[in-house]
UniProtKB/Swiss-Prot annotation:
One of its GO terms (cellular component) is cytosol. The modification N6-(pyridoxal phosphate)lysine is found at residue 274. One of its GO terms (molecular function) is glycine dehydrogenase (decarboxylating) activity. The glycine cleavage system is composed of four proteins: P, T, L and H. In this organism, the P 'protein' is a heterodimer of two subunits. One of its GO terms (biological process) is glycine decarboxylation via glycine cleavage system. It holds the Pfam family GcvP2_C. It catalyses: N(6)-[(R)-lipoyl]-L-lysyl-[glycine-cleavage complex H protein] + glycine + H(+) = N(6)-[(R)-S(8)-aminomethyldihydrolipoyl]-L-lysyl-[glycine-cleavage complex H protein] + CO2. Its EC number is 1.4.4.2. CDD domains: GDC-P. This is Probable glycine dehydrogenase (decarboxylating) subunit 2. InterPro entries: GcvPB (IPR023012), GDC-P_C (IPR049316), GDC-P_N (IPR049315), GDC_P (IPR020581), PyrdxlP-dep_Trfase (IPR015424), PyrdxlP-dep_Trfase_major (IPR015421), PyrdxlP-dep_Trfase_small (IPR015422). Belongs to the GcvP family. C-terminal subunit subfamily.
Length: 492
């Protein structure tokens, strides 16, 4: 059977002798590789690279690109990921020659504009979060978590307090929290949630103590609920001598409305590729700046951009610093995009962003909670969780619902996270989606709920319209095929 271009590997359309590009003539004398490299470094067999024409190359990758789904092609309600629209003006700003055509090793006097942007971004992020100083070095959220925990470790060790080896993490936390704590050399202690979906204060107080380095907390949490006991939580941690760490993954709910620093947090990381519209994933990279209160400033990674009478400089004179956490000064291009977004929106605009993100989430929750179980039937913040346990009782799981959504042209929400909600469906619409889009998605979810009751096989066998149908995900995880292996010719 003939395979379409979407089903064929580029290796499978290779024909010997075909080329996609004519290389220019060399401008230097040609020298054989054997004259330059020792024999053990030379390839003994031809490399198996595809030989295709330019037209075949373009058609192949264009077909593959049409299978991608991103915020520019459709609704992307991935909970706890803030898949908001990335304004294209940010791309224009990042491509300005003064930002795009410079090198981090240039003399500082020749990159004053870039350093000025970095300094102003540090200042603005400090104001937004209620922190006293910010570093732009961390490359993404988990990297920011690790950096923040290393700052906390440096703080405790500088005080001769080496017994603080434990980091408390709620059972609803992002998986990166315990992972970052482990990589930073801490032991993780899980704090339970109560019947409200919030931190169980009694459980927290029974576990915080002289060995506590920090509590990592997201507020609002991953259930989309605001930790209303945050002042008492901060008091319990601080009285035990620990620090309070803010995972900024859900900051889109509180910008311009509440600040982590005012809640009692000592360290904050932000995800500029989420909350502040830097592109995600293949459109990245990310950026995870970390802000701290005054007593942690000495330990920040160096250098920090500082302002002097002569201009902006890179301040390396920080003897207590934990050192660099990334080459140079962070993912500068994403920082430019975030700065453009902040300057465009202004303080009032950022507050409106959060209000509309919360409004959109509550609107969707109100429409869907009749067809799906809502474990916490209260007002949410920027995201909310549903449970597919009602559908599971009819033989259809959350995974099946997610697969069926593909037929409607939607990227599925986050599923099976947080772990403390059975058959979890986690939805975050963000502020950039219209009511019409929200209604269309809710209509699809309601139709699927009806199908589960009336025609379950339609859901169980979904997706029906995508190029790739159901895969054996267990086999793919256990026996992945990670590279192309040409079939061996059989000679009779």
């Amino acid at each position: 059977m003939h395979k379409t271009s979407e089903q064929t590997l580029i290796f499978e359309i290779s024909k010997a002798g075909r080329v996609a590009y004519s290389l220019p003539l060399p401008t230097v004398d040609e020298v054989a590789a054997e004259e330059l490299l020792p024999a053990h470094l030379l390839r003994q067999e031809d490399v198996e690279l595809p030989e295709v024409s330019e037209l075949d190359l373009v058609r192949h990758y264009t077909a593959l690109s049409n299978r991608n789904h991103g915020v520019d092609s459709g609704f992307y309600p991935l909970g706890s990921c803030t898949m908001k629209y990335n304004p294209k003006i940010n791309e224009d700003m990042a491509r300005l020659p003064g930002f795009a055509h410079i090198h981090p090793l240039q003399p500082v006097e020749s990159v004053q504009g870039a350093l000025g942007l970095m300094y102003d971004l540090q200042e603005k992020l400090a104001v937004i979060t209620g922190m006293d100083e910010v570093t732009l070095q961390p490359a993404a959220g988990a990297h920011g978590e690790w950096t923040g925990l290393m700052l906390i470790k440096a703080y405790h060790h500088a005080r001769g307090d080496f017994k603080r080896t434990k980091v408390l993490v709620p059972d609803s936390a992002h998986g990166t929290n315990p992972a970052s704590a482990s990589v930073a050399g801490f032991d993780t202690v899980t704090v339970l949630s109560d019947e409200r979906g919030l931190v169980d204060l009694a459980d927290l107080k029974s576990k915080v103590g002289e060995d506590t380095a920090a509590l990592m907390l997201t507020n609002p949490n991953t259930l989309g609920l605001f930790e209303s006991d945050i002042v008492e939580i901060a008091k319990a941690v601080h009285e035990a001598g620990g620090k309070l760490y803010y995972d900024g993954a859900n900051s889109n709910a509180i910008m311009g409305i509440a600040r982590p620093g005012d809640m009692g947090f000592d360290v904050v990381h932000l995800n500029l590729h989420k909350t502040f519209t830097g592109p995600h994933g293949g459109g990245g990279p990310g950026s995870g700046p970390v802000g701290v209160k005054k007593d942690l400033i000495p330990y920040l990674p160096k250098p920090i951009v500082a302002k002097t009478a002569e201009g902006f400089v890179l301040d390396y004179d920080r003897p207590e610093s934990i050192g660099r956490v990334k080459p140079f000064y962070g993912n500068f291009g994403i920082n430019v995009r975030a700065y453009s977004y902040i300057r465009t929106m202004g303080g009032a605009g950022l507050a409106r962003v959060s209000k509309e993100a919360v409004l959109n989430a509550n609107y969707m929750l109100a429409r869907l909670k009749g067809a799906y179980d809502a474990p916490y039937d209260v007002y949410c913040k920027h995201e909310f969780v549903l449970s597919g346990r009602r559908q599971k009782a009819l033989g259809v799981r959350t995974l099946d619902i997610a697969k069926r959504l593909l037929d409607f042209g939607y990227h599925p929400p986050t599923i099976y996270f947080p772990l403390n909600v059975e058959e979890c469906i986690m939805i975050e619409p963000t502020e950039t989606e219209s009511k019409e889009t929200l209604d269309d998605f809710c209509d699809a979810m309601l139709q699927i709920a009806k199908e589960v009751e009336e025609t379950p096989d339609v859901v169980l066998n979904a997706p029906h319209t995508t190029v790739v149908k159901r895969m054996d995900e267990t086999l793919a995880a256990r026996k992945p095929i990670l590279r192309y292996q040409p079939k061996q010719e059989v000679h009779v």
